[in-house]
């Protein structure tokens, strides 16, 4: 163990020697930069950009660029970065994490790598934990960047898409971690390229990186919308409709357990829902409801595929074991359709439209770096998950803070009495005190006790970032007493007031140990900034959460041996510190394992999300005919339909293929079983494909120009992809909950999730291509379709399920009722645009 520790220390020292060598080179330019006029110094930015364009790397530009920023900061802000800050800046540029103590000037340190990377012109994102810090840092440090000719933007949640786009197009963009993540998700939900706000993700520099990438790693960002009561009504209406059908109105393919409406069923659907054409692009959502209602009523069997529990819940039956599968729901809306069929309550759920974890969000940047004062304890996680090293940077001045040994009390009450007594004693002499708690409830409890003791104080609990920053700035003044939860005021320095140094500086009192050593170190680090004097003291009790869960038995036994069980007994021992640290390491290990598992699950979705988003972005940005892509989908859909019956009885197979072709591909009278008999599967595929191509060309000929064709193709694909992807995310969530239970059966849930998730993804791709094919082949296209569909696609979900076609029958030529409708739908005039005339 000692050898490993020695090796780590030597590696750190070697890294620091390299950094110091580069830092000295930066410092060697100081006199040269100081001699330049403001105009010449500002002109360096354009010079660097030109040199970069000609082939110089950012690493080659680093010494001069850092020197320019140092001189600019001195002229604009009156601040001149120290050598240790230069070293920290180099670490950031390398895509690592410099561990810099509180008060060592991390914000100023960041200006150098931010400026250097902005020269590339691909955008730099400076990420903070709240909007107060984004606004503050962008305003203060933005003066330096603006002076040097770079543009600076602030991305706030309240900004409009146009304002966000402007902020992201700046050389440097300040934003919170959550807003960057949500903007990424929203960008992958729009249907027009001009509605996107972000550029490709280039370089992110994350302030308080441990908070963002470690503490919040388990919480995914989710864009969701509540499923409306109107949606539930559509499940019920679709169910009522399919219950009116007879066996001639639908066709079941037994081997594949699929079902579709026959021509008579389509006619009934159009009549029931008052539509001119069921397969118009505007009715994609409705056809989805009808498909599910058909499956629920005529494919899914009560007491075989599912059961209804006594409390009215639909439970899936495992086909292999015959047992019900608790917690599982059929995906893609089928479960709700069965609930409608059985007349039980349709469970309203918020539907996730998009989600991502911070882990996978920030791993998408070409380069990622971060700053914090406390990260060394999480070094393994940073290295394994983010490929980032933790480089401890020496302080500019030696640390003068005194860290006292922990004090342990038998009960919470005796501990809090001791805390109040300590505060009272220190307050009497004017020493400022920061009392740190792990929960808002504890803050309120301490506050009440201080009120009873007559001690004036401020309470912070991370609710108002702007107000708390002002309070925390004054926490170092003589006589100040401040109570704060762990994260409150983080990012704001506590500067000592006049005469406070002589009183011992700021005293930090911890009311219990946090699960993470890193959080405790952050609290300690609020005191003793830049060589200031200070103190820290932690108060513990056997009733603290950490002590109850880990290690308290040994300490209790120690107390029993010492016969120190009185209420106000206190113990102070090195053994106590070792026990607490051991408990914290165990909790940290458990939390790391949890975060690692979250990442393993999200990696499955990440791969699928990247495929969907990349294809989606390709569609949005395309200025070309998407015909080749759609034709490929049609070809694969036909191939799947034919292959699904390869092992069936030949007559049954031909009948099923004809049914597929008639319901999803071509007009009913244009294909028959007779012409397909005697053909091999490959010949059938080719014949159906050529027929489909003819229909495809016929469909697009109804649009006036190439622009209209491209717009129609885009909307067709995007509406179906978004609908299926949303359903797929929901299905993956349900799968994840279900496979977690399988861990009890000695199965690896992550492996099962990966295998089943991949199969579900393949099924979703097939469903997308089938819906695109069916809608393309069966949609009644007219010129107004383009505008209507485009407008609809900009909303979160298609709403106009019951809208009618606006074609005017007066404009059509005189047609007999049983003749083909001139609109090109392939239907009889009486069942299409002639319906109103003959009703």
Swiss-Prot record:
One of its GO terms (cellular component) is cytosol. InterPro entries: Helicase_ATP-bd (IPR014001), Helicase_C-like (IPR001650), P-loop_NTPase (IPR027417), SEC_C_motif (IPR004027), SecA (IPR000185), SecA_CS (IPR020937), SecA_DEAD (IPR011115), SecA_motor_DEAD (IPR014018). Keywords: ATP-binding, Cell membrane, Cytoplasm, Membrane, Metal-binding, Nucleotide-binding, Protein transport, Translocase, Translocation, Transport, Zinc. Zn(2+) binds at residues 821, 823, 832-833. It is an enzyme of class 7 (translocase). It is found in: Cell membrane; Cytoplasm. This is Protein translocase subunit SecA.
